[in-house]
């Protein structure tokens, strides 16, 4: 088993999908969390100057979803068939497209608040309706077993509920899916022991 070192801020953010996968697959890794104050001196040392990165076998891999796909490859978490893997990837990419619209780094607080409000009030309901329809009466997004798409839904929706607590009130099936993910023993244990951060 390779030695893994995950580098990210002390928050859930874009690294949490990687942490969920490590937890579920029972893979040991170093969860190295950096403080915002240290970021300016660390940034120039990284390929592409972004985190999270995963250090493995002398390589530094960037891009959270690429790392997640690497870790889930050849496991059922990715999907059991090529078609199911494509479906899981599509759900993840749909969620990621939306989460990437938020201006997390915007310095103008008034503008940031307006943009967040627009996304949460007008665009989020459309996304949730589509996800609810896609889930339908299935137990998980891709049928009868959990994939990393379900993990990513739980992670993204947790952040959305921090930003707008009542957002899922009319989507009981999506709430139920969150609950099922959080009830998986390995995920439940991780949620209990992880550092408590807002995002």
Swiss-Prot record:
InterPro entries attached to this UniProt entry: Glutathione-S-Trfase_C-like, Glutathione-S-Trfase_C_sf, Glutathione_S-Trfase, Glutathione_S-Trfase_N, GST_C, GST_superfamily, Thioredoxin-like_sf
Cofactor(s) needed: glutathione
Residue ranges occupied by any GST N-terminal domain in the UniProt entry: 2-79
Known catalytic reactions: prostaglandin H2 = prostaglandin D2; RX + glutathione = an S-substituted glutathione + a halide anion + H(+); 2-glyceryl-prostaglandin H2 = 2-glyceryl-prostaglandin D2
Annotated ranges, domain GST C-terminal: 81-199
PROSITE patterns in the record: GST_CTER (PS50405), GST_NTER (PS50404)
An annotated GO BP: prostaglandin metabolic process
SUPFAM superfamilies: GST C-terminal domain-like, Thioredoxin-like
Tissue: Expressed in skin and oviduct.
Subcellular location: Cytoplasm
GO cellular component, one term: cytosol
Binding locations of glutathione: 8, 14, 39, 49-51, 63-64
Entry EC number(s): 5.3.99.2, 2.5.1.18
Gene3D superfamilies: 1.20.1050.10, Glutaredoxin (3.40.30.10)
Chief localisation class: cytoplasm
Cofactor annotation comment: Glutathione is required for the prostaglandin D synthase activity.
A Gene Ontology molecular function term of the record: calcium ion binding
Record-stated family: Belongs to the GST superfamily. Sigma family.
Record's subunit section: Homodimer.
Chain's role: Bifunctional enzyme which catalyzes both the conversion of PGH2 to PGD2, a prostaglandin involved in smooth muscle contraction/relaxation and a potent inhibitor of platelet aggregation, and the conjugation of glutathione with a wide range of aryl halides and organic isothiocyanates. Also exhibits low glutathione-peroxidase activity.
Database matches in PANTHER family: GLUTATHIONE S-TRANSFERASE, HEMATOPOIETIC PROSTAGLANDIN D SYNTHASE
Protein name as catalogued: Hematopoietic prostaglandin D synthase
Lineage: Eukaryota, Metazoa, Chordata, Craniata, Vertebrata
Gene (name only): Hpgds
């Amino acid at each position: 088993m390779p030695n893994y070192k995950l580098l990210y801020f002390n928050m859930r953010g874009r690294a949490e999908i990687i942490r969920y996968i490590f937890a579920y697959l029972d893979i040991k890794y170093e969860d190295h969390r950096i403080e915002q104050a240290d970021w300016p001196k660390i940034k120039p040392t990284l390929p592409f100057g972004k985190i999270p990165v995963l250090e493995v076998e002398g390589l530094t891999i960037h891009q959270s979803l690429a790392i997640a796909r690497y870790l889930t490859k050849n496991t059922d978490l990715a999907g059991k068939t090529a078609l199911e893997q494509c479906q899981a990837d599509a759900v993840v990419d749909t969620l990621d497209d939306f989460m990437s619209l938020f201006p997390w780094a915007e310095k103008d607080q008034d503008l940031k608040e307006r943009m967040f409000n627009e996304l949460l009030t007008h665009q989020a309901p459309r996304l949730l309706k589509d996800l609810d329809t896609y889930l339908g009466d299935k137990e998980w997004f891709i049928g009868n077993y959990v994939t990393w798409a379900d993990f990513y839904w739980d992670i993204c929706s947790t952040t959305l509920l921090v930003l707008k607590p009542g957002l899922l009130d009319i989507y009981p099936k999506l709430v139920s899916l969150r609950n099922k993910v959080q009830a998986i023993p390995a995920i439940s244990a991780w949620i209990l022991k992880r550092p408590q951060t807002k995002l």
